[in-house]
Amino acid sequence: LYSFYSSNNGSPLATTIRAIKDIYTKLPKDAKIVQSCSTGYGEALIKSALMLDDGEVETVSHFYAAAFFDPEVDCIIDIGGQDMKCIKIKNQTVDSVQLNEACSSGCGSFIETFAKSLNYSVQDFAKEALFAKHPIDLGTRCTVFMNSKVKQAQKEGAEVSDISAGLAYSVIKNALYKVIKISDPGDLGKHIVVQGGTFYNDAVLRSFEKITGVKAVRPDIAGIMGAFGAALIARERYDGISESTMLSIDKINELTYSTTMTRCKGCTNLSLIHI
């Protein structure tokens, strides 16, 4: 399975073009792209710019990917660096979606921030959590408050392992009690698939299972499930005959574009946007 994982650095189109160029350096000479599909935040932009065959909303792509690993999936928990969402599945279709509405400070990226502040890589910081004896209780509050709690715990002699485990618990508690707003973890479902880059952290996965009492499925491609789902959709919609509408690599190499900044007039905030 080919994958390309990168921050978009504020330009999803430029990053996508970089990924496609990388794909073509690895494609066998007798292979070609016959169907394409975009998903996620830049779905419409990428589809239009590169003339892709399809585009699909992120929730549907996540469902396709989750169902590949568990055909009976009835709940998908997705925790990324900046957002978290819960997708409930009913009768093999997306029934409801809940996500963090404004603040992203309780999402996965704050574990990375804390790890760096303690001079640990994310991977080593996560491993420490697995050997915690007394995880500190950080609750479900904002990162600003957690910072002060962590500093206080350090003053009181808390081990790095206990801090890391406490943060892993906190991410899950934020997802369950602040975003999904459940009172009984049993309401989540019986076939749960967890995904998003944050779940590469074994401590976060274990925290989820301990809090909910449910054994979840975590695919080994947890961080790219949206893209994997889009690939499955493209394969399903291919008729086996038609040529892809996607721009050829030569045309992609020749593609030029410009960006301008303006203010969105969709509401009274008049936010600055790039076009």
Regions found by a protein language model. Name each.
Residues 40-42, 170, 183-211, 222-223:
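Glycine-rich phosphate-binding loops at beta-strand->alpha-helix junctions
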Residues 148-177:
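Adenine-nucleotide phosphate-binding core of ATP-dependent small-molecule kinases
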Residues 9-11, 91-134, 223, 232, ...:
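Glycine-rich phosphate-binding loop plus the immediately following alpha-helix
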Residues 64, 111-113, 220-247:
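Glycine-rich phosphate-binding/hydrolytic loop that grips phosphoryl groups
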Residues 273-275:
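Conserved small/polar residues in nucleotide/adenosyl-binding loops
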Residues 22, 166-189:
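Phosphate/ATP-binding catalytic cores across multiple sugar-kinase/actin-like superfamilies
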Residues 53-59, 209-228:
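Conserved phosphate-binding/catalytic loops in two-lobed NTP-binding clefts
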Residues 16-18, 43-80, 85-92, 96, ...:
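Conserved phosphate-binding catalytic cores of ATP/NTP-utilizing and phosphoryl-transfer enzymes
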